[in-house]
Regions:
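Intrinsically disordered, low-complexity Ser/Thr/Pro/Gly-rich regulatory segments
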Residues: 1-228
Length: 228
């Protein structure tokens, strides 16, 4: 088992531009330290139904209402997350979708890097990498995030919503885990979905592709990424 950079095709070039947007890095940094309620706020706003901050402040009284902190770091983060999420919501539908996907990948990378040793200069955490196995045709699509630690490798695919869970994704993750086992290697297959866990489980129940050995990280459990 070995890891390789993805080929710089047209898709990769376009997506690299999206990932390099300051808004992506700013939103990801905020969401990496966010509370569950703040992450739910971000998801709701970024769906683009309304770009009026007052609408969302009224819908999330625990963050902005009379009982919410009037000031301090938590209130400032809520305001910053709302502002960044509105910026995403104001984009056109296609660009908004791309930006949201890039944010989920960036949040995932930031949290994974908090694991012991993962933040070192020679970090094993990488983006957009393929996993190669002897005698097996390489997958077309690279993995969003990989942890390339010998004996504790991980392939992570990231999705904005539960509807992104499909047979192709599940097959690719499970195939990688299986091929690694064939080579006596350990590889954890993980899918990160920025959506409610219940929605993800309902979606998985409808899938016939193998997923029993694939780890699910949903909106409520994002912080588990930092603990392995």
């Amino acid at each position: 088992m070995r890891f390789q950079d993805a080929s710089p095709d047209a898709r990769a070039v376009v997506y690299a531009g999206i990932q390099a947007e300051p808004l992506v890095a700013r939103a990801a940094a905020l969401l990496a330290d966010a509370t569950p309620a703040q992450r739910v706020l971000a998801r709701a706003v970024m769906n683009g139904m309304s770009v009026g901050p007052a609408v969302w402040q009224a819908m999330f009284p625990t963050l902005f209402g009379p009982g919410a902190p009037a000031d301090g770091a938590e209130r400032e983060r809520s305001e910053a997350i709302l502002a960044a999420s509105v910026e995403v919501a104001e984009r056109g539908e296609q660009v908004r979708s791309q930006v949201r996907g890039a944010i989920v990948e960036s949040v995932t990378e930031l949290l994974v890097r908090r694991r012991t040793g993962a933040a070192a200069p020679t970090s094993p955490v990488r983006r957009e990498r393929r996993i190669l196995f002897d005698g097996v045709r390489a997958e077309i699509h690279p993995y969003d995030v990989t942890v390339e630690t010998p004996g504790a490798a991980e392939a992570i695919d990231c999705k904005w919503g539960a509807r992104g869970i499909n047979a192709d994704v599940l097959h690719q993750l499970d195939d990688a885990r299986t091929h690694a086992a064939d080579e006596d290697e350990v590889l954890t297959a993980t899918i990160v979905v920025f959506d409610a866990e219940r929605s993800c489980l309902v979606r998985l129940e409808r899938q016939t592709a193998p997923h029993e050995a694939t780890r699910l990280i949903a909106l409520e459990t994002l912080d588990r990424l930092a603990a392995r």
